[in-house]
Regions:
Chain B
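ABC ATPase nucleotide-binding domain helices that frame the ATP-binding cleft
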Residues: 43-46, 142
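ABC ATPase nucleotide-binding domain
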Residues: 5, 25, 61, 342-344
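The feature captures the beta-strand-to-loop junction immediately N-terminal to the Walker
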Residues: 35-37
Length: 312, 362
C-alpha cells in the first residue's frame, strides 16, 4: 500500500491526511507554497551571485535537481552576500570596512525582546486585574487602552519625537524600549485578559480554600494555565516589534539603530543602485531569529490561538 | 471542635437576596445536606461558609470562631467542587499534595499522606497523570482526596456527584459516606438530588428561595414535612397535594370536600384547631389502598395512565372533578387504563396543610 510506505516516510503521520484525503492535502500544499514563494525567492536571491539578481528570465534554483531544471534557470550558490552584510568596501576600489550590522542585529534582538517581555510582565498583571477585579467602568478602560493602537504611527510620531527630544530619550535604548512596550501593552492586555477570562473560577476558589494567598493563586494556579497564551502573545508582539520601521527610523540613534532602519540605509547608500542580493541576504538573516522563536513556540502558539474554542 | 454554625446569615447580591436569615448548626461528625431546587440559595450558603462570598448580615462561626472577615485561605476548611476544580497543570499527586504546602508539612510526610489518601480512594495508579487524562470518577475521587488529605475544620461538598453516571454515583455515595464516617468533622453537602441527601445526610436542610424550610433527619423530613413545599419536594413519586374544603372535625375524623367529593377521613387531632375553610391534603402515592367498593372514606378516580416501574406500578388517576392523583401499587395488582379505583388514604400518612401551606400536626 502506498499509504503505508508514505506513512513510514513520515507523511500522513497526522491523521489529517486520512481525514481530508490526498486531493485536499495537495491543494493546501499548493496554496501554502504560493504563500511561501516570495520568502523562498528572497532566500534564494541571498545566495545568488550579485549579477544574477535581476536576470530575466530569473534563475530559480541552486541545483538542477539531477537535470530536471534546465541549466539557464540554475544559479551557482554563494555565501559572498552574507559576508558583505557585515563587511564590504564602501567605494568602488576601497578596502572592506565593517558595516556595523552585528550591532544592528544585536539592537533589534535586544530592543524587541526587552520591550515585548516588559509588556508581557506588565500586561499580564494588568490583564489579571481587569479580569478578576473588575473596576467600575472596566470595559471603558479597556477600550481606552486599545485606542492607542487605533491611530497609525505616522499620526503620533511628531508629538512623540518632540517629547523624546525634550526629555532626552531620542536615540537611547530606554526611549525606544519604552515606546515599544507602551505599544505592545494594549495588545498584551487584551490578549491575556481573554485568556484569564476563560479560566474556571472554581479552580482559583479551590486554591484559595486550600490555603493559597492571592499572589500564590496567580503564580501557581493561573499562570501555568495560560502558558499557551503567554507564548502566543509573545510571538505576535515580537513579530510586530521586530518589523517596526517608522518609530525606529525616527527615534533610534546611530548606536541604537535596528535592522529595518539599517537595511533601508544599506539599500540607498553607496550610489550604485540597489544591491538586491545584499538586501536579500540581510532579510534572510533577519528572518532567522523570529523564525526560530516561532518554530520553538509553535505548539503553544497553536493551542494559544485556538484557546477556548474547544470544549473544556 | 469541628463545628459549623450559621447565625441569621443573609446574603444579598445587589437588590437580590440569595440567602435570607439562615440559621443552621452542624455538629462535629455530622453530615448536613442542603437540598433544594436550583436557584434556592444552597450553593451560595455553602460559598458563604467557605468565605468565597462575604455575608451581608449575620455570623458564620466555624470551630467556635466567628469567621465573617476571614478570607477562605484562613478558614481551614476543605471543599469539593461540582466540577472538581482540579489544578489542570499539576499532576493528580501534586493536586492532592497542594493543600499540604500551606500547612508547612515536610516532603516525606507529604508523600506519605498523599499515598495514604490515594490508597483509600484507589488513586495510586493515576498519581502521575494530569487531571485531563483521568476518568470522571477518578477526578471526583482526586477532588475528594485533596479535601481529606489534611485535617481541616470542616468539609464542604458542592454537588459532588452530579457529574457522574448513575452507577458510579451509587458507588461514590457509599464511598463518600464511608470516608466521612471515619473523620468526625462537620460536613455540609449541597445537592439537588433528594436521593443523595436522604442516603448521605444525618440531617437535611431543605431550602427554597433563600430560606430554610425545614431541617430534620431524612426520616423526619419524609414522614413529617413541615409544609407543602417540603412534602412535594421529598419523595418519589411526588406526594399528592389535593385542594380541600374542610367542613368539620370530630372524633379524629375530618369532613371535607376534595375535588368535588365529600370525604370523611381520619387525620391528625391538631386539625381540630383549624377553622373550616381551604386546606391542602397531602397523601403519598404509596399511602393509598385501592378498595373494591367506595365509601365516604375513599376517593374515586379513573386510571388514565399506567407506568410500570419494576417492583411497583405507578398509576396516574383522575377524579371526576379533574384532580390528578398518583398512586403506586404493587406489581401483582393489575390495573387497566380506564378502570375505576376507590382509593383509601392511610390516615397515619395523610398530611393536612393549612391555608398558608404549613403542616397541621400535634
Amino acid at each position: 500500500m502506498a499509504e503505508s510506505i508514505l506513512g513510514k516516510l513520515g507523511f500522513g503521520r497526522a491523521s489529517g491526511v486520512d481525514k481530508a484525503g490526498w486531493g485536499r492535502t495537495l491543494a493546501v500544499a499548493v496554496v501554502a507554497f504560493i504563500y511561501f514563494l516570495p520568502v523562498l525567492f528572497i532566500i534564494f536571491t541571498a545566495f545568488k551571485p550579485q549579477g544574477d539578481a535581476l536576470l530575466v528570465p530569473p534563475t530559480l534554483s541552486p541545483t538542477s535537481l539531477f537535470g530536471l531544471i534546465p541549466d539557464h534557470f540554475v544559479f551557482k550558490p554563494t555565501l559572498e552576500n552574507f559576508g558583505s552584510v557585515f563587511s564590504r568596501s564602501m567605494t568602488p576600489d576601497g578596502a572592506p570596512e565593517a558595516t556595523g550590522f552585528d550591532r544592528y542585529f544585536f539592537n533589534s534582538i535586544f530592543i524587541a525582546s526587552a520591550s515585548v517581555l516588559l509588556a508581557l510582565v506588565i500586561g499580564t498583571l494588568a490583564a489579571f486585574g481587569f479580569s478578576r477585579y473588575p473596576l467600575k467602568g472596566n470595559d471603558t478602560y479597556l477600550f481606552i487602552i486599545l485606542t492607542t493602537r487605533m491611530l497609525p504611527a505616522i499620526v503620533v510620531i511628531i508629538p512623540v519625537i518632540l517629547m523624546f527630544r525634550v526629555v532626552g530619550l531620542s536615540g537611547s535604548y530606554l526611549g525606544i524600549i519604552m515606546l515599544y512596550t507602551a505599544f505592545n501593552l494594549a495588545f498584551t492586555i487584551w490578549m491575556m485578559k481573554s485568556f484569564f477570562d476563560e479560566l474556571s473560577p472554581d479552580v482559583e476558589d479551590a486554591a484559595r480554600i486550600d490555603g493559597s494567598s492571592g499572589m500564590r493563586v496567580f503564580f501557581k494556579i493561573c499562570l501555568p494555565q495560560v502558558i499557551a497564551g503567554l507564548a502566543a502573545t509573545f510571538v505576535f508582539g515580537l513579530i510586530l516589534t521586530w518589523n517596526e520601521f517608522l518609530f525606529a527610523l525616527l527615534l533610534s540613534g546611530p548606536d541604537t539603530r535596528t535592522v529595518p532602519v539599517a537595511m533601508n540605509q544599506a539599500v540607498s547608500s553607496g550610489g550604485r543602485g540597489t544591491d538586491w542580493t545584499l538586501l536579500a541576504a540581510i532579510e534572510t538573516l533577519f528572518l532567522i531569529p523570529v523564525f526560530l522563536v516561532t518554530f520553538f513556540l509553535q505548539n503553544h502558539l497553536l493551542r494559544g490561538v485556538t484557546f477556548g474554542t474547544v470544549k473544556r | 471542635m469541628s463545628t459549623i454554625e450559621l447565625r441569621k446569615v443573609t446574603k444579598r447580591f445587589g437588590s437580590f437576596t440569595a440567602v435570607k436569615n439562615v440559621d443552621l448548626s452542624v455538629a462535629a461528625g455530622e453530615v448536613v445536606c442542603l437540598l433544594g431546587p436550583s436557584g434556592c440559595g444552597k450553593t451560595t450558603t455553602l460559598r458563604v461558609i467557605a468565605g468565597l462570598e462575604s455575608v451581608t448580615d449575620g455570623e458564620v462561626v466555624i470551630a467556635g470562631k466567628v469567621m465573617n472577615n476571614l478570607p477562605p485561605e484562613k478558614r481551614d476548611i476543605a471543599m469539593v467542587f461540582q466540577f472538581y476544580a482540579l489544578y489542570p497543570s499539576a499532576s493528580v499527586g501534586e493536586n492532592i499534595a497542594f493543600p499540604l504546602y500551606h500547612d508547612g508539612i515536610s516532603g516525606a510526610e507529604r508523600t506519605a499522606r498523599v499515598n495514604r489518601v490515594a490508597a483509600i480512594l484507589h488513586l495510586e495508579h493515576v498519581l502521575d497523570r494530569l487531571p485531563n487524562q483521568i476518568s470522571e470518577g477518578e477526578k471526583q475521587r482526586a477532588a475528594m482526596a485533596r479535601a481529606i488529605v489534611r485535617d481541616p475544620n470542616c468539609f464542604l461538598f458542592d454537588e459532588p456527584l452530579s457529574r457522574l453516571d448513575v452507577e458510579l454515583r451509587q458507588s461514590m455515595r457509599g464511598q463518600i459516606k464511608e470516608v466521612l464516617q471515619g473523620l468526625s468533622k462537620a460536613t455540609v453537602i449541597v445537592t439537588h438530588d433528594q436521593l443523595e441527601a436522604l442516603t448521605m445526610a444525618d440531617r437535611i436542610a431543605i431550602m427554597k428561595d433563600g430560606l430554610i424550610e425545614q431541617v430534620g433527619s431524612p426520616h423526619e423530613v419524609f414522614a413529617k414535612p413541615a409544609n407543602a413545599f417540603v412534602a412535594s419536594f421529598i419523595g418519589t413519586p411526588q406526594m399528592n397535594l389535593l385542594e380541600a374544603d374542610l367542613k368539620t372535625f370530630a372524633d379524629g375524623t375530618a369532613e371535607m370536600t376534595v375535588a368535588g367529593i365529600n370525604l370523611a377521613i381520619r387525620t391528625d387531632a391538631a386539625v381540630a384547631r383549624l377553622q373550616p375553610g381551604k386546606v391542602t391534603i397531602g397523601v403519598r402515592p404509596r399511602a393509598f389502598t385501592a378498595t373494591d367498593t367506595g365509601d365516604r372514606g375513599t376517593i374515586s378516580a379513573r386510571a388514565e395512565l399506567i407506568e410500570p416501574m419494576g417492583a411497583e406500578t405507578l398509576i396516574h388517576a383522575r377524579t371526576a372533578a379533574g384532580a390528578d392523583i398518583r398512586v403506586v401499587v404493587t406489581r401483582s395488582q393489575r390495573v387497566k387504563v380506564g378502570e375505576a379505583l376507590n382509593l383509601r388514604p392511610d390516615p397515619r400518612q395523610t398530611h393536612v396543610f393549612d391555608g398558608a401551606g404549613k403542616a397541621v400536626r400535634s
